[in-house]
Amino acid sequence: MAGCGEIDHSVNMLPTNRKANESCANPAPSLTVPECAICLQTCVHPVSLPCKHVFCYLCVKGASWLGKRCALCRQEIPEDFLDKPTLLSPEELKAASRGNGEYAWYYEGRNGWWQYDERTSRELEDAFSKGKKSTEMLIAGFLYVADLENMVQYRRNEHGRRRKIKRDIIDIPKKGVAGLRLDCEANTVNLARESSADGADSVSAQSGASSVQPLVSSLRPLTSVDGQLTSPATPSPDASTSLEDSFAHLQLSGDSIAERSHRGEGEEDHESPSSGRVPAPDTSVEETESDASSDSEDVSALVAQHSLTQQRLLVPNANQTVSDRSDRSGIDRSVAGGGTVNAGVRSRRPDGQCTVTEV
C-alpha cells in the first residue's frame, strides 16, 4: 500500500482550509476544478477539445474567433465544436441554471434571455448590492461594461453595440447559460456561429428559410403566330419582319376586308391582265396561314410569304393612285399637244417592280 509520501499532491491543489500535514488523514483526493490557460482562472463550464486540452467554454469561443486553433498546441478546432461542445460536467450546467440564490442575472438574446455564468453573476450582484453605477466584466477575452443604471452592457472599446441586461428570479424561462443551451435537442441541430463573445444567440433563421417553398411561376398561355404555337420564350418565325410592317398589317386589315367586299371573294389582283406587268404569285393571307400551319413548310418560306403578303396589302391603294395620276397626266399631254399622244408612264411599286400604263 502506498504511503503518504508517494502520493503526488501539491499544496495548491488542496482546499485552503486544510494544511499540508493533514493530507495523510484522508488519503482519498478531492476532485479539483482545472484551470484555464486563457483566462488564468478556474474553468467555468470546462470543455475538452479534441486535443484533450481543457478551457472555459467562453474562452474557447473567444479564442476561436482569433484563430480556430488550440491556445496551447495550435491544433485546429472543429467548426461545429461551439455548437456541440464536449462538457466535462454536464450536470454542472443544469445546476447552474437552477442557481444557488433567489435572483440571477440575464442578458438579452434573440427570442429569449441567457443567464450569465456563475462568476459573472457574482460580480454583477456584488456591484449591484454596493450601489455601483457600472462594473467591468471579462467575457471570452473581451472587456465588457455593465451599466447598472440603464441596464445595458457593451464592449469597452465599442459603445455602439448594446445589449439589455436584467436581474430576475432564478426560475424564469431561459435559453441557457452563457451560450450553452439547456435543451439537448438543440445540440443535434447545426446552428450558426454566434456573433458576440458573451454567448448571444444569433442563430440565423435557416429553418424558416428552408420551409418557405419556392414561388411557382405561372405559365403564360401559348400564343399562335401564323398557325404555330409559340411560348413567350420561343421566338416567332416572323421575328425578322420590322415593327412597321406589323403595324401596317394591323391597320390595313380592315381595309383589305372592305376591298374584298366589292372586289369579290378570291380576287386578289387589282390590275387588269392588259397591264403588261408580270403577275405575282397568287397567294392570299388565308393561303399563307394554311401553309404555315402545316408541319412540312419551311421557316424561311414562311417568312418570305408573310413579307410578300404584307407588301401585297400595301400595293392596291398605291397602284390605284399611280394609275389615276398616269391617266390624268396622259390626258393633259393629249390636250396640250392638240392630238392623241401615246405616253408611257412608269410607276414604281414598293417591291421593286415597275408597271407601264398605256394611254
Curated annotation (Swiss-Prot):
<feature type="binding site">
    <location>
        <position position="114"/>
    </location>
    <ligand>
        <name>a glycoprotein</name>
    </ligand>
</feature>
<dbReference type="Pfam" id="PF13920">
    <property type="entry name" value="zf-C3HC4_3"/>
</dbReference>
<comment type="pathway">
    <text>Protein modification; protein ubiquitination.</text>
</comment>
<feature type="cross-link" description="Glycyl lysine isopeptide (Lys-Gly) (interchain with G-Cter in ubiquitin)">
    <location>
        <position position="175"/>
    </location>
</feature>
<dbReference type="GO" id="GO:0090263">
    <property type="term" value="P:positive regulation of canonical Wnt signaling pathway"/>
</dbReference>
<feature type="compositionally biased region" description="Acidic residues">
    <location>
        <begin position="284"/>
        <end position="298"/>
    </location>
</feature>
<keyword id="KW-0862">Zinc</keyword>
<feature type="zinc finger region" description="RING-type">
    <location>
        <begin position="36"/>
        <end position="74"/>
    </location>
</feature>
<dbReference type="GO" id="GO:0005829">
    <property type="term" value="C:cytosol"/>
</dbReference>
<comment type="subunit">
    <text>Can form homooligomers. Interacts with PARsylated AXIN1, AXIN2, BLZF1, CASC3, H1-2, IPO7, LIG3, NCL, PARP1, XRCC1, XRCC5 and XRCC6. Interacts with DDB1, DHX15, IQGAP1, LRPPRC, PARP2, PRKDC, RUVBL2, TNKS1 and TNKS2. Binding often leads to interactor ubiquitination, in the presence of the appropriate E1 and E2 enzymes, and proteasomal degradation.</text>
</comment>
<keyword id="KW-1017">Isopeptide bond</keyword>
<keyword id="KW-0879">Wnt signaling pathway</keyword>
<dbReference type="GO" id="GO:0005634">
    <property type="term" value="C:nucleus"/>
</dbReference>
<dbReference type="InterPro" id="IPR044110">
    <property type="entry name" value="RING-HC_RNF146"/>
</dbReference>
<dbReference type="GO" id="GO:0070936">
    <property type="term" value="P:protein K48-linked ubiquitination"/>
</dbReference>
<dbReference type="InterPro" id="IPR013083">
    <property type="entry name" value="Znf_RING/FYVE/PHD"/>
</dbReference>
<feature type="binding site">
    <location>
        <position position="144"/>
    </location>
    <ligand>
        <name>a glycoprotein</name>
    </ligand>
</feature>
<keyword id="KW-0833">Ubl conjugation pathway</keyword>
<dbReference type="InterPro" id="IPR017907">
    <property type="entry name" value="Znf_RING_CS"/>
</dbReference>
<dbReference type="GO" id="GO:0051865">
    <property type="term" value="P:protein autoubiquitination"/>
</dbReference>
<dbReference type="GO" id="GO:0004842">
    <property type="term" value="F:ubiquitin-protein transferase activity"/>
</dbReference>
<dbReference type="InterPro" id="IPR037197">
    <property type="entry name" value="WWE_dom_sf"/>
</dbReference>
<feature type="compositionally biased region" description="Polar residues">
    <location>
        <begin position="306"/>
        <end position="322"/>
    </location>
</feature>
<feature type="cross-link" description="Glycyl lysine isopeptide (Lys-Gly) (interchain with G-Cter in ubiquitin)">
    <location>
        <position position="84"/>
    </location>
</feature>
<dbReference type="GO" id="GO:0061630">
    <property type="term" value="F:ubiquitin protein ligase activity"/>
</dbReference>
<feature type="cross-link" description="Glycyl lysine isopeptide (Lys-Gly) (interchain with G-Cter in ubiquitin)">
    <location>
        <position position="94"/>
    </location>
</feature>
<keyword id="KW-0963">Cytoplasm</keyword>
<dbReference type="InterPro" id="IPR018123">
    <property type="entry name" value="WWE-dom_subgr"/>
</dbReference>
<dbReference type="GO" id="GO:0016055">
    <property type="term" value="P:Wnt signaling pathway"/>
</dbReference>
<dbReference type="GO" id="GO:0072572">
    <property type="term" value="F:poly-ADP-D-ribose binding"/>
</dbReference>
<feature type="domain" description="WWE">
    <location>
        <begin position="91"/>
        <end position="167"/>
    </location>
</feature>
<dbReference type="Pfam" id="PF02825">
    <property type="entry name" value="WWE"/>
</dbReference>
<keyword id="KW-0539">Nucleus</keyword>
<keyword id="KW-0597">Phosphoprotein</keyword>
<feature type="binding site">
    <location>
        <position position="110"/>
    </location>
    <ligand>
        <name>a glycoprotein</name>
    </ligand>
</feature>
<keyword id="KW-0479">Metal-binding</keyword>
<dbReference type="InterPro" id="IPR033509">
    <property type="entry name" value="RNF146"/>
</dbReference>
<dbReference type="InterPro" id="IPR001841">
    <property type="entry name" value="Znf_RING"/>
</dbReference>
<feature type="binding site">
    <location>
        <position position="163"/>
    </location>
    <ligand>
        <name>a glycoprotein</name>
    </ligand>
</feature>
<protein>
    <recommendedName>
        <fullName>E3 ubiquitin-protein ligase RNF146</fullName>
        <ecNumber>2.3.2.27</ecNumber>
    </recommendedName>
</protein>
<dbReference type="InterPro" id="IPR004170">
    <property type="entry name" value="WWE_dom"/>
</dbReference>
<dbReference type="GO" id="GO:0006511">
    <property type="term" value="P:ubiquitin-dependent protein catabolic process"/>
</dbReference>
